[in-house]
Amino acid sequence: LAIRDLDAAEVVSLGCFSPAKLEGGGYLIQSSYSFVDGRNLIVCPTSHNHVLMLKATDETGTPLPIFEKVLDINIKAAAERVLGRTLEQNLLSIVFDYEGNLWFVTGGFRIYPDRGQQGAMGYISHAAIETILAGGTADLDHEVHVYAPQPGEGAENGIASCREGAVILTNLACYLLRADNGVDIVWRTPYASAGAKDSREGAATTGG
């Protein structure tokens, strides 16, 4: 991730965060699912199932040469501890709800129901995030709340928030979830799905 001056005579980086350079690599930032929150922090999922929050500017708005990592949570490991089981899907995407809870989903672009992979959806509480950002230690065993859908169900690039909670689209259903000291399923609407479609010539479908 980098901040670049596109108006300069020569495009230069004003600040950056590079896992390969700063931490020896081993993971990538999922930049397509990253965003800037109301604190002006970059919130990003990673390829090794962590959620990071990065401070990219100082109090005057000047870019920091090296972004400061102010939060780092292994969300898959935290979810596995809460569930007491192994998750076979990786962290896909994240979103804040209107109460400041950070929702997360596991999944991918091709989740096949018949393969029975176990995934999860849930949230890190607003209180835990505030504690960590203030320099404290949060009890993630009690501040990470998880719902495990049926094996073979996982998110496929669909997560958003609204005043009522978090809307999550999986390969089998659409959910409205609400944070209530746990994951409250307000509603679940299923639809027919058999995984990726065959996209060979003449199949009349794309993808696969």
Give the label of every model feature segment:
Residues 1-208:
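Secretory-pathway ectodomains
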